Curated annotation (Swiss-Prot):
Modified residues (N-acetylserine): 2
Tissues of expression: Isoform 2 is expressed in brain. Isoform 1 is present in immature thymocytes (at protein level).
Subcellular localization(s) per the UniProt record: Cytoplasm
Protein name: cAMP-regulated phosphoprotein 21
Residue ranges crossing the lipid bilayer per the database entry: none
Residue(s) carrying Phosphoserine: 33, 56, 134, 300, 363, 383, 562
Domain SUZ: 228-300
Length: 812
């Protein structure tokens, strides 16, 4: 409009000059042709200006700016080019100025009408243009920065899952905004700069106006004439891309799979083989079960086979090393009446409690495989009822356990305490060890077959009983030893009942022994134990400790651990030397009942002597250093009856016995340093008594016995043959044997200054009958302070000897 005003002003000025200067009529006629040309030029200029304005308006609607032509330059160039003509025809133009003004007005009206028509045409033509853009040019939208929005949005949807969720949510909100005719703008919440950039680009993609609020953190979008909804949603692009990617990945995975290659190769090599992938779930489960059963069955079979293989290997070793006892078998844990095998409750270490001569099964806990002569094993009766066997390596390293560990069943504990016996031997080549199993039981059960007692090797022709020494003083002459279970007396090898007939010279010496024991009341009587009554014989015996026939094993459940001095024995023992073990005694021990004839005899032994009684109850009290352990239910009374009358059945009435008080210290512990012990099984070639196994106290542990406030106990192991009943050969005075020649007092010297016994020694008497050839019999006193052990009569020729060692040993 400013340009038109300038033109009008110029025309008005020209008209003014024409009015002032009057011209002749012929001049006016000459210039009419020129005036028409000028009018045409003016019309062309106005039309060009109008078109430029229309273009600028339409470009502003599209967001583009176009520069209009410079009119001043053309207007300035026109007067310069036509200056000559103007000067020549000024008078003509001035004459026709009035007509020109009228024409200009009509032209302006026409131009305004044309402008209005053009605007209406532009408005009607914009709608089809938008439709054409949404259909044909949807892929051609670009941002103000020149970024292709379609490509940017597709890449963002593919690559970033977080941006994908933002774009999908934003798309839904914008579509809802466009569909809502009531709202003309929408304000997004405050967000980060990256998210605002996404909003700007999505709004531009939808043809919306997008700006930022005053804070600069929120985007406001407005509807425009170019607002559109794209035909293809964002989720459609995702579906297409996901389908393509998944197909590509699947193909690559199939091609690059090494498992599939191996399967394909195997299938090519074996075309009739079923493919691994074609197996169903049921087939896979069946195959898994088969493999599982095979594996676990193999383990159980191997564990059981290893036990028997090792047992057989040990048996072969013992047969090779000991040629004189090739036919003797290793004792394994018997199966109980229910046919229960030893695999369920029996560990492999319990079956490994057997060793061959000079060769013990190697244990993984051995620190030195060459150290075979180890210290005694120790059986521990813990509160849980298990029995652990520990083997000492040497006298100095008491903390190193190199033996097997053996544990009995959990049912072996009882209120009175469980008890067991140790079985550890290392015999030389000349003899077979007496090994007893670990046994512990609760009342009313037979635990030895169930707990799996370790293997025992013993001569088949001898067995041993440990009896208190006090029984020798309380048994009246002419008494017969009866079997408490059968009621039958023990018989000699010739079939005659075994009659106990001590010599007359033993009576005064017996009283002398009692006198010596009474000379030390402070050490014998300071801590008396409660009196223990006689337990009735139980029908079941627990823990056979000697390998004999079944009737023997079920009746006598004792074992002894003999202790051998380390180097002070006057004569090397004929039996093997082994470490002995110290076993805490349970609350009760096997009781020995002596029924005398009618005569009154004083209470013998080394405990405090009580009033004269006709019957004596000899029951060892608990002791921490026990060599014989018997479960509480396995009470085994031994009855002595005078000669001439004895019961022949188990219905014979037995009188109750009077209790005898014993002194023992349960809390005393036995030192493990430098303890040597010896199992001395006696080699026999004849029936009858084969010998005596004794226990000798080493000088290192003598102070333990002497320091205890009780009476040191000497025990003797009496051997008896395996016959229909226990045969204890006794002698009678009527046989006319020169008994005084076989009875020699044996002094038991103790170390001076220890205060338990006088240094002069303690006499021990032997009453032995000579029906059978002589054998090596050893009578060795142990360190057990619980009770005393009688010297039983043995059927062999004797030579009594004395020892100067701590402890005592008798050789026959």
């Amino acid at each position: 409009m400013s340009e038109q005003g300038d033109l009008n002003q110029a025309i008005a000025e020209e008209g003014g000059t024409e009015q002032e200067t009057a011209t002749p009529e012929n001049g006016i006629v000459k210039s009419e042709s020129l005036d028409e040309e000028e009018k045409l030029e003016l019309q062309r200029r106005l039309e060009a200006q109008n078109q430029e304005r229309r273009k600028s308006k339409s470009g502003a609607g599209k967001g583009k700016l176009t520069r209009s032509l410079a009119v001043c330059e053309e207007s300035s160039a026109r007067p310069g080019g036509e200056s000559l003509q103007d000067q020549e025809s000024i008078h003509l133009q001035l004459s026709s100025f009035s007509s020109l003004q009228e024409e200009d007005k009509s032209r302006k009206d026409d131009s305004e009408r044309e402008k209005e028509k053009d605007k209406n045409k532009d408005k009607t033509s914009e709608k089809p243009k938008i439709r054409m853009l949404s259909k044909d040019c949807s892929q051609e939208y670009t941002d103000s920065t020149g970024i292709d929005l379609h490509e940017f949005l597709i890449n963002t949807l593919k690559n970033n899952s977080r941006d994908r969720m933002i774009l999908l949510k934003m798309e839904q909100e914008i579509i809802d905004f466009i569909a809502d005719n009531n709202n003309h703008y929408k304000k997004f919440p405050q967000m980060s700069s990256y998210q605002r950039m996404l909003v700007h680009r999505v709004a531009a993609y939808f043809g919306l106006d997008h700006n930022v609020d005053q804070t600069g953190k929120s985007v406001i979008i407005n509807k425009t004439s170019s607002t559109r909804i794209p035909e293809q949603r964002f989720c459609e692009h995702l579906k297409d891309e996901k389908g393509e990617e998944s197909q590509k990945r699947f193909i690559l995975k199939r091609d690059n799979s090494s498992i599939d290659k191996e399967d394909n190769q195997q299938n090519r090599m074996h075309p009739f083989r079923d493919d691994r992938r074609s197996k169903s779930i049921e087939e896979r489960e069946e195959e898994y079960q088969r493999v599982r059963e095979r594996i676990f069955a193999h383990d159980s079979v191997c564990s059981q086979e290893s036990l028997f293989v090792e047992n057989s290997r040990l048996l072969e070793d013992s047969n090779i090393c000991n040629e004189t006892y090739k036919k003797r078998q290793l004792f394994r844990g018997n199966r109980d009446g229910s046919g229960r095998t030893s695999g369920s409750r029996q560990s492999s270490s319990e079956n490994e409690l057997k060793w061959s001569d000079h060769q013990r099964a190697w244990s993984s806990t051995d620190s030195d495989s060459s150290n075979r002569n180890l210290k005694p094993a120790m059986t521990k009766t813990a509160s849980f009822g298990g029995i652990t066997v520990l083997t000492r390596g040497d006298s100095t390293s008491s903390t190193r356990s190199t033996g097997k560990l053996s544990k009995a069943g959990s049912e072996s504990s009882s209120s009175a305490g469980s008890s067991g016996s140790l079985s550890r031997t290392h015999p030389p080549l000349q003899s077979t060890p007496l090994v007893s199993g670990v046994a512990a039981g609760s009342p009313g059960c037979v635990p030895y077959p169930e707990n799996g007692i370790g293997g025992q090797v013993a001569p088949s022709s001898t067995s041993y009983i440990l009896l208190p020494l006090e029984a020798a003083t309380g048994i009246p002459p002419g008494s017969i030893l009866l079997n408490p279970h059968t009621g039958q007396p023990f018989v000699n090898p010739d079939g005659t009942p075994a009659i106990y007939n001590p010599p007359t010279s033993q009576q005064p010496l017996r009283s002398a022994m009692v006198g010596q024991s009474q000379q030390q009341p402070p050490q014998q009587q300071p801590s008396p134990q409660p009196q223990q009554q006689v337990q009735p014989p139980q029908p079941q015996m627990a823990g056979p400790l000697v390998t004999q026939r079944d009737d023997v094993a079920t009746q006598f459940g004792q074992m002894t651990l003999s202790r051998q001095s380390s180097g002070e024995t006057p004569e090397p023992p004929s039996g093997p030397v082994y470490p002995s073990s110290l076993m805490p005694q349970p609350a009760q021990q096997p009781s020995y009942v002596i029924a005398s004839t009618g005569q009154q005899l004083p209470t013998g032994g080394f405990s405090g002597s009580g009033p004269p009684i006709s019957q004596q109850v000899l029951q060892p009290p608990p002791s921490p250093q026990g060599f014989v352990q018997q479960p509480p239910p396995a009470q085994m009374p031994v009855y002595y009856y005078p000669s001439g009358q004895y019961p022949t059945s188990t219905t014979q009435q037995y009188r109750p016995m009077a209790p005898v008080q014993y002194n023992a210290q349960r809390s005393q512990q036995m030192p493990q340093a430098a303890q040597q012990a010896g199992y001395q099984p006696v080699l026999s070639g004849q029936q009858g008594f084969q010998g005596l196994i004794g226990v000798q106290q080493p000088p290192q542990s003598q102070n333990v016995i002497n320091n205890q406030q009780g009476t040191p106990v000497q025990s003797v192991m009496v051997s008896y043959p395996t016959m229909s009943s226990y045969q204890v050969p006794m002698t009678q005075g009527s046989q006319g044997l020169p008994q005084q020649s076989y009875q020699q007092p044996i002094m038991l010297p103790n170390q001076a200054g220890q205060g338990s016994l006088p240094a002069t020694g303690m006499p021990v008497y032997c009453n032995v009958t000579p029906p059978t050839p002589q054998n090596n019999l050893r009578l060795i006193g142990p360190h057990c302070p619980s009770s005393t052990v009688p010297v039983m009569s043995a059927s062999c020729r004797t030579n009594c000897a004395s020892m100067s060692n701590a402890g005592w040993q008798v050789k026959f």
